[in-house]
């Protein structure tokens, strides 16, 4: 691997902060020079309160007693390091839920010009849980109907959907079926009877990335994925029964089949499980070899990458597409199980309960898209890590049903807090490559959360709020407690006020199922 650029001498916080300037009430700019070799600026969407959080993290990093101990660099440094990657255009963009991660910060968007032969693809810009995403189903049920049975319904969901670390799926999957899943995505779900035709229409990429090549997925990745189809997993993944709490845009909400406060919806948050993690892990070794061969230098080893046009780059994109297809089938399988649970509870088939998919979005993926850069339409490889595609009205890649509203964007809150449906805007298309936030974003590490919170207290608070809770690993709930995250409403409002997405519906949970 080519040597990483030598780090600049340690600077004081004041030295570092001089490179971070306020553009407006919703945005700060990280100027070139903040880290070596920046080709574009960093642009971070934050309001005053969220700005204070990212600057506090930078201040802690600059304190000689608080850093140099390993771990991730602060989010501002990671955003700037991405701005130094070959072929990057526009800006390295961070959304309000940004926090440090592996390579790219979580909440980072970066686009690379396919027409530039030096442009790269980086697994760190997608993440280990490839196509981690969110799906929302609506129903014609009301809180008055579901509230009295929410405990039983939460238990039914918990019984139907395998959850937790190492959970095994109940959707029968043979090695041959897995090959088809990796290649076909939701077309497999449709063929096998686990999805409705409209589900596919209301899924990003229509639930299938066409460049998928199962031969590029390792045997180990397939072995990990085989038993996990239709499983929720652990961490911040969940299935929630939610009710409509507020409607901000009645026209858009009605297009989504949401027409009243108190209407019951179901949100599913999960990804590609062990298969996606293994695809990412496998790619890093190949990327390091490619960097050494092609003389690619990066500021951080975790930004291992390869030229898009290289064999390594193409192999990763083909394997990543397989993992993305797996994730869509995984969420489709859980949708099937969720529909079964509701049908059993209410004694009606799912179609009579109007259990249609509103939309399914990915927030860990890299895709080829057309965007305007400096007045010229270009094909870009857009990396979205912990950020969501948010295309505007009339965009050709969003469903007919949403041509007048813009793409629905699903923003999951933290355990026990509200979630949101947003819609994409033209301003977002211009300013953020058609991207917005994906959730609340961590404010406290998992490790710190485990040390300062008690799981009994977290569960008791949820019960006090009237939320039914089923958890496979109770001692891990501290990691996902609301206190461990930023305020999702602050995050969503920042994006709304900046004009990069528009608030449509607010949802609140009445039952939560977690791993």
Curated annotation (Swiss-Prot):
Q: Which GO terms describe its biological process?
A: tRNA splicing, via endonucleolytic cleavage and ligation
The lineage's top-level taxon is: Eukaryota
Keywords for this entry? GTP-binding, Ligase, Manganese, Metal-binding, Nucleotide-binding, tRNA processing
EC number of this enzyme? 6.5.1.8
According to its record, what are the GO cellular component terms? nucleus; tRNA-splicing ligase complex
Active site per UniProt? 438
- List the Pfam families hit by this protein, alphabetically: RtcB (PF01139)
Residues bound to Mn(2+) 2? 132, 269, 363
Binding, Mn(2+) 1: 129, 132, 237
Identify the cofactor(s): Mn(2+)
Catalytic reaction list:
a 3'-end 3'-phospho-ribonucleotide-RNA + a 5'-end dephospho-ribonucleoside-RNA + GTP = a ribonucleotidyl-ribonucleotide-RNA + GMP + diphosphate; a 3'-end 2',3'-cyclophospho-ribonucleotide-RNA + a 5'-end dephospho-ribonucleoside-RNA + GTP + H2O = a ribonucleotidyl-ribonucleotide-RNA + GMP + diphosphate + H(+)
Where would you find the membrane-spanning parts of this chain? Answer: none
- Report residues binding GMP: 236-240, 363-364, 412-415, 419, 438-441, 514
A single MF term (Gene Ontology):
metal ion binding
Q: How is the cofactor bound?
A: Binds 2 manganese ions per subunit.
Q: Which family does it belong to?
A: Belongs to the RtcB family.
Additional free-text comment from the UniProt record? Ligation probably proceeds through 3 nucleotidyl transfer steps, with 2',3'-cyclic phosphate termini being hydrolyzed to 3'-P termini in a step that precedes 3'-P activation with GMP. In the first nucleotidyl transfer step, RTCB reacts with GTP to form a covalent RTCB-histidine-GMP intermediate with release of PPi; in the second step, the GMP moiety is transferred to the RNA 3'-P; in the third step, the 5'-OH from the opposite RNA strand attacks the activated 3'-P to form a 3',5'-phosphodiester bond and release GMP.
Instruction: Give a short account of what the protein does.
Output: Catalytic subunit of the tRNA-splicing ligase complex that acts by directly joining spliced tRNA halves to mature-sized tRNAs by incorporating the precursor-derived splice junction phosphate into the mature tRNA as a canonical 3',5'-phosphodiester. May act as an RNA ligase with broad substrate specificity, and may function toward other RNAs.
What does the subunit section of this Swiss-Prot or TrEMBL entry state?
Catalytic component of the tRNA-splicing ligase complex.
- This protein is called RNA-splicing ligase RtcB homolog
What species is given as this protein's source? Ostreococcus tauri
Q: What is the lineage of its organism?
A: Eukaryota, Viridiplantae, Chlorophyta, Mamiellophyceae, Mamiellales
């Amino acid at each position: 691997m080519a040597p990483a650029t030598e780090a600049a001498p340690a600077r004081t916080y004041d030295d570092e902060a001089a490179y971070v300037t306020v553009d407006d009430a919703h945005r700060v700019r990280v100027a070139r020079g903040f880290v070596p070799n920046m080709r574009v600026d960093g642009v971070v969407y934050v309001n005053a309160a969220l700005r204070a959080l990212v600057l506090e993290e930078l201040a802690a990093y600059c304190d000689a007693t608080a850093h140099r101990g390993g771990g991730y660099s602060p989010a501002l440094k990671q955003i700037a390091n991405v701005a130094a990657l070959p072929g990057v255009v526009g800006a390295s963009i961070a959304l309000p839920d940004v926090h440090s991660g592996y390579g790219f910060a979580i909440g980072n968007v970066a686009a690379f010009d396919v027409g530039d032969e030096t442009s790269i693809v980086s697994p760190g810009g997608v993440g280990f849980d490839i196509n981690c995403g969110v799906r929302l189903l609506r129903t014609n049920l009301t809180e008055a109907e579901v509230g009295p049975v929410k405990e039983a319904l939460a238990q039914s969901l918990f019984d139907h959907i395998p959850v937790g670390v190492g959970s095994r799926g109940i959707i029968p999957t043979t090695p041959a079926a897995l090959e088809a899943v990796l290649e076909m995505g939701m077309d497999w779900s449709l063929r096998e009877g686990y999805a409705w035709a409209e589900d596919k229409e209301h899924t990003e990429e229509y639930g299938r990335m066409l460049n998928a090549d199962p031969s590029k997925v390792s045997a180990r990745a397939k072995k990990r994925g085989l038993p996990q189809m239709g499983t929720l997993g652990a961490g911040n993944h969940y299935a929630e029964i939610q009710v409509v709490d507020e409607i901000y845009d009645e026209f858009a909400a009605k297009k989504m089949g949401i027409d009243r406060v108190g209407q019951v919806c179901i949100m599913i948050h999960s990804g590609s499980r062990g298969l996606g993690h293994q695809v990412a892990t496998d790619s890093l070794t190949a990327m390091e070899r490619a960097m050494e061969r092609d003389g690619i230098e990066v500021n951080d080893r975790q930004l291992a990458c390869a030229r898009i046009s290289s064999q390594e780059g193409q192999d990763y994109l083909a394997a990543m597409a397989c993992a993305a297809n797996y994730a869509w089938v995984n969420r489709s399988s859980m949708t099937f199980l969720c529909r079964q649970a509701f049908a059993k509870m209410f004694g009606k088939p799912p179609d009579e309960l109007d259990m249609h998919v509103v939309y399914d979005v990915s927030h860990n993926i890299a895709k080829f898209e057309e965007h305007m850069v400096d007045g010229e339409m270009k094909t870009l490889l857009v990396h979205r890590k912990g950020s969501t595609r948010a295309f505007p009205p009339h965009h050709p890649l969003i469903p007919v049903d949403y041509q007048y509203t813009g793409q629905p964007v699903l923003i999951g809150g933290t355990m026990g807090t509200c979630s949101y449906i947003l819609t994409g805007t033209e301003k977002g298309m211009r300013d953020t490559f058609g991207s917005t936030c994906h959730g609340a974003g961590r404010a406290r590490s998992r490790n710190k959360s485990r040390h300062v919170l008690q799981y009994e207290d977290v569960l008791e608070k949820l019960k006090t709020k009237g939320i039914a809770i089923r958890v496979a690993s109770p001692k891990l709930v501290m990691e996902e407690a609301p206190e461990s995250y930023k305020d999702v409403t602050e995050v969503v409002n920042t994006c709304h006020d900046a004009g990069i997405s528009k608030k449509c519906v607010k949802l609140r949970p009445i039952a939560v199922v977690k791993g």
